[in-house]
Curated annotation (Swiss-Prot):
Family: Belongs to the Fmt family.
InterPro entries: Fmt (IPR005794), Formyl_trans_C (IPR005793), Formyl_trans_C_sf (IPR037022), Formyl_transf_N (IPR002376), Formyl_transf_N_sf (IPR036477), Formyl_transferase-like_C_sf (IPR011034), GART_AS (IPR001555), Met-tRNA-FMT_C (IPR044135)
PROSITE patterns recorded: GART (PS00373)
Protein name: Methionyl-tRNA formyltransferase
Catalytic activity of the protein: L-methionyl-tRNA(fMet) + (6R)-10-formyltetrahydrofolate = N-formyl-L-methionyl-tRNA(fMet) + (6S)-5,6,7,8-tetrahydrofolate + H(+)
EC numbers, comma separated: 2.1.2.9
Keywords: Protein biosynthesis, Transferase
One annotated Gene Ontology cellular component of this protein: cytosol
Catalytic EC class: transferase
Pfam families: Formyl_trans_C, Formyl_trans_N
Residues involved in (6S)-5,6,7,8-tetrahydrofolate binding: 112-115
Length: 314
């Protein structure tokens, strides 16, 4: 097997786990690209990405262009003489000039079984849609958005209690080995890519805070999936007594209620039951303003007046 010279491009922890796998492989990472440092935390201090921190710990050259569209940035990348560029949650668009620069092109690790859930939020959208399985796809990049030919797929089930946080960890465990296997196969000239069927594609749009507002007219099953899809961000929420309350955990209670959607049916140590468009949603772990997430029992000890039966939410 030939030893390949790699450029790695990525930004969050998910990407850093893939970089770590490449650093333990037989190949040479000659440079790392990541997004510019950004303000974070209460002090809004400029903070390096997890990928940058890992790269610096391994004394790798780090490049942080605001864009790869400029000729200077493209020339700088070409001068690295890489055989292959590996892209994982980088966050910048790669123009055709960059895609064509490495001898073997650019490959991308995507958190879904393409062509399902192209786009920015595949993990969250797969949970929200009630998919039974998802996985990781490694594709040869082209100028489209997650439209490239697929080199390798690894699947995993989505558990009934899966959150975006837990599924993120699952895929971050699956992806690195699949990536190393793919790079090894490319080094040996032993890969075949399968074109995506555009007719089977759908799009995983980026999440918004407003989208996380609970619509009680939806079915309880769908709302419960939302609470898991939006955990750990932006967290599903509703308003009561003029306050915003976040929902970290809920469950579906299979019962008919005969009440208007959004009606509070009961509140006790078992949970807070809310009528929905179909079925009942039982709220289990909530976060009131300025507090940490807490059990319903703890919240009712201090705010029972918010949750009187018959109260209409939203």
């Amino acid at each position: 097997m030939n030893k390949l010279k790699l450029i790695f491009a990525g930004t969050p922890d998910f990407a850093a786990r893939h970089l770590a796998a490449l650093l333990s492989s037989d190949h040479e990472v000659v440079a790392v690209y990541t997004q510019p440092d950004k303000p974070a935390g209460r002090g809004q201090k400029l903070t390096a990405s997890p990928v940058k921190e890992l790269a610096l710990a391994h004394n790798l050259p780090v490049y942080q262009p605001a864009s790869l569209r400029k000729e200077e940035a493209q020339a700088e990348l070409a001068a690295l003489g890489a055989d292959l560029m590996v892209v994982v949650a980088y966050g910048l668009i790669l123009p055709k000039a960059v895609l064509d620069t490495p001898r073997l092109g650019c490959i991308n690790v995507h958190g879904s079984l393409l062509p399902r859930w192209r786009g920015a939020a595949p993990i969250q959208r797969s949970i929200w849609a009630g998919d039974a399985e998802t996985g990781v796809t490694i594709m040869q990049m082209d100028v489209g958005l997650d439209t490239g030919a697929m080199i390798r797929k690894v699947s995993c089930p989505i558990a009934a209690d899966e959150t975006s946080a837990s599924l993120y960890d699952k895929l971050a465990g699956l992806g690195p080995q699949a990536l190393v296997d793919t790079v090894n196969a490319m080094a040996a000239g032993n890969t075949a890519a399968e074109a995506q069927d555009d007719a089977q594609a759908n799009y995983a749009e980026k999440l918004s805070k407003e989208e996380a507002r609970i619509d009680w007219s939806m079915e309880a099953v769908a709302i419960e999936r939302c609470t898991r899809a939006f955990n750990p961000w932006p967290i599903s929420w509703f308003e009561v007594a003029g306050q915003t309350v976040k929902v970290w955990q809920a469950e579906v209670v299979a019962q008919d209620h005969g009440q208007a959607a959004g009606t509070l049916l009961k509140a006790d140590k078992q949970g807070i039951d809310i009528a929905t468009g179909k079925g009942v949603l039982r709220l289990l772990t909530l976060q009131p303003p300025g507090k940490k997430a807490m059990s319903v029992t703890d919240l009712l000890n201090s705010r029972r007046d918010w949750f009187e039966p018959g109260t209409q939410l939203n």
